Regions:
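Membrane-water interface segments at the C-terminal ends of transmembrane alpha-helices
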Residues: 28-62, 69-176, 200, 204-225, ...
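Glycine-rich helix-loop "coupling/hinge" segments at transmembrane-helix boundaries
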Residues: 226-252, 289-290
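Short, Lys/Arg-rich, polar N-terminal cytosolic tail immediately upstream
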Residues: 2-29
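The alpha-helix within a helix-turn-helix
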Residues: 186
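Short, Lys/Arg-enriched, Gly/Pro-containing loop segments at transmembrane-helix junctions
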Residues: 182, 281-290
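Glycine/proline-centered hinge or cleavage motifs at structural transition points of membrane proteins
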Residues: 189-190, 203
Length: 290
């Protein structure tokens, strides 16, 4: 007798390429809906509802009261101080954050891991402690002879301290993934070090730099704890908007405080949106040129 070999496709038709595959584990519509629902609820409770509440409170006195709150001399001066110092701090951290990230990725030296861990210290340190540290180092009894208490430079140093990690941590992963062969090829063609950096490395780092700058700027304009002691809230000099908000709350003007908060939120959102768009275009250009 001739042995008949069973056709495996007849026994298990799902092995045939003509049979559409079933849903992958964890991708069912019910599971997806559950995940999306949980994410939406959590995002609403933690972010959206508080933002809606502060917007509602800022409109409690009507448009006229809102405008009076944000256009008063004290408010305008606090905006000026906040934006000026925050912009300066962002530029400083862009430069030195890039240098630090470069050193941590491209150079080897004793204590490298310790330095890398110290970068995250401002994230873990309570901001009021950061202000106390700044006061101890740069206050009237400064052990190094730098008396920055109640000066804009003191506020600048404090904000630079708490925002530096944003740039470093944004740039580091991109530097680690950069293809060194492209740099070596440019060098073999006679390109100088600065030319290689500006034409090969910097375009690849631009999206990360913009992302870090946006986060650093947004953190700086809303910072309170790190500047409260070293700055001293001198009107028109060191009083940032967050300190003016505290003054309004202490004077039982919660509507005015909410109005100032909305302006800061709007500025932060617009800056992040613009930098995200610019960074996205830069990333696309980099992909097309690769």
């Amino acid at each position: 007798m001739t042995a008949i070999t069973p056709d495996p496709l007849a026994i298990r038709p799902e092995l045939s390429g003509d049979t559409p595959p079933g849903p992958l584990p964890g991708r069912g519509s019910g599971t997806t809906a559950l995940r999306v629902g949980a994410a939406t609820v959590w995002l609403s409770v933690i972010v959206l509802l508080p933002l809606a509440a502060i917007a509602w409170q800022s409109a409690g006195g009507g448009w006229h009261a809102f405008w009076l709150a944000v256009s008063s001399n004290a408010a305008v001066e606090s905006f000026r101080v906040t934006l000026t110092i925050s912009a300066g701090v962002t530029v400083l951290n862009l430069v030195f954050g890039l240098v630090i990230a470069w050193v941590l990725v491209r150079d080897d030296f004793p204590g490298k891991r310790l330095v890398d861990a110290i970068i995250d210290l401002p994230f873990a340190l309570p901001t009021i402690v950061a202000s106390l540290v700044m006061l101890a180092l740069y206050g009237n009894n400064s052990p190094i002879g730098l008396h920055l208490q109640h000066t804009s430079w003191g506020v600048t140093v404090a904000l630079a301290f708490v925002t530096l990690p944003f740039v470093v941590r944004a740039v580091q992963p991109v530097l680690l993934e950069l293809d060194r062969e492209t740099e070596e090829a440019a060098a073999s063609l006679g390109a100088s070090g600065p030319k290689i950096f500006t034409s090969v490395v910097l375009p690849s780092l631009l999206p990360a730099l913009l992302s870090g700058a946006g986060l650093a700027f947004s953190r700086a304009i809303g910072e309170f704890g790190s500047v409260v002691l070293i700055g001293g809230a001198v009107p028109g000099k060191t009083e940032v908007s967050s300190q003016w908000i505290r003054t309004l709350i202490e004077n039982d003007d919660r509507t005015g405080a909410a109005a100032i908060s909305i302006v800061l939120l709007a500025i932060s959102f617009v800056v992040l949106l613009i930098l995200r768009i610019v960074g996205g275009h830069a990333a696309k250009r980099e992909e097309l040129s690769a």
